[in-house]
Amino acid sequence: MFGTIKKIIKDKGFGFITPDDGTDEVFFHRSRLSPKVYFEDLREGDEVQFDVRPGEKGPQAFNLRPR
């Protein structure tokens, strides 16, 4: 799946992605990034690729990487 990082909460270690397909925002956590992708390097507006799985409060991204 592809999308754009909408919001990053650096001090909490998570953020939200707006998927390109128009579906609901997807939560991501720093612990679910692809290897060699560093949370500190991510910026709002970055285009990313990711996989999605159901989470406790909605869809969650994992294997997050730059597009």
Regions found by a protein language model. Name each.
Residues 4-33, 38-39, 60-63:
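S1/OB-fold single-stranded RNA-binding interface
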Residues 1-2, 67:
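Absolute protein N-terminus
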Residues 53-67:
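OB-fold/S1-family single-stranded nucleic acid-binding modules
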